[in-house]
Amino acid sequence: MTKRYWNINLEEMMEAGVHFGHQARKWNPRMAPYIFTERRGIHIINLTRTARFLSEACDLVFDAAGKGKQFPIVGTKYQAADSVASAAIKARCHYVNKKWLGGMLTNWSTTGTRPRKFKDLKKEQDTGQSNRLPKKEAAMLKRQLAQLQKYLGGIKYMTSLPDIVIIADQQEESTAIGECITLGIPTICLVDTDCDPDLTDIPIPANDDARASIRLILNKLTSSICEGHYSSMKGESMKS
């Protein structure tokens, strides 16, 4: 894996509040190597460690994006949901930002059919076929579409299990992490001071409650993915 410079600035991270952890009494001792100090009962995250792991994660996704790998971004709590969607759309990634449905990955043989169903129903609606349905059936179709869009809209183009999953909050997305562990899918995850860094392949020590912190970390990762896509396209055009 080639190391690159990703312009990860400690001052920028401080302004975003990346360094603020949880109350010291709520900590996970496994986060000790990533904690700088305790201030007024709050753990302060060591941002030099954050920068190191974030840079490592950026290198990984850059290389993987250049090989056409898939990266769903997962973050369903309200502080993360909007940032997850905007970052994923920017980098042409899949995303889940409303609710992680149990078995979304471990039961992919079923989950994978739902986006296809969504596209079929959407086509019916767009072509006006639903207008010929009885009123009750048309209303049912509309409800189905709304539900599928809400929970699966971000993965409607995902045709196979992902290669790497980016997770905005370990505690909130424990089911997703468990499924990735079961299937051996690598994860990149923001870990606050109450998390277990051993549950993820690349833990990024960071405040997982502040919108600015989540947005900054996700933007660095998705910028690296975009650069990986661009580098790959540039390489292909030079060959032809």
Curated annotation (Swiss-Prot):
Pfam families: Ribosomal_S2 (PF00318)
GO MF terms, alphabetically ordered: structural constituent of ribosome
Record keyword Ribonucleoprotein present: yes
The UniProt record lists the keyword Chloroplast: yes
Compartmental location: Plastid, Chloroplast
Keywords: Chloroplast, Plastid, Ribonucleoprotein, Ribosomal protein
Gene3D superfamilies referenced in this protein's UniProt entry, alphabetically: Glucose-6-phosphate isomerase like protein, domain 1, Helix hairpin bin
Transmembrane segments: none
GO BP annotations, alphabetical order: translation
Record GO cellular component, one term: chloroplast
Similarity field: Belongs to the universal ribosomal protein uS2 family.
HAMAP family: Ribosomal_uS2_B (MF_00291_B)
Protein name per its UniProtKB record: Small ribosomal subunit protein uS2c
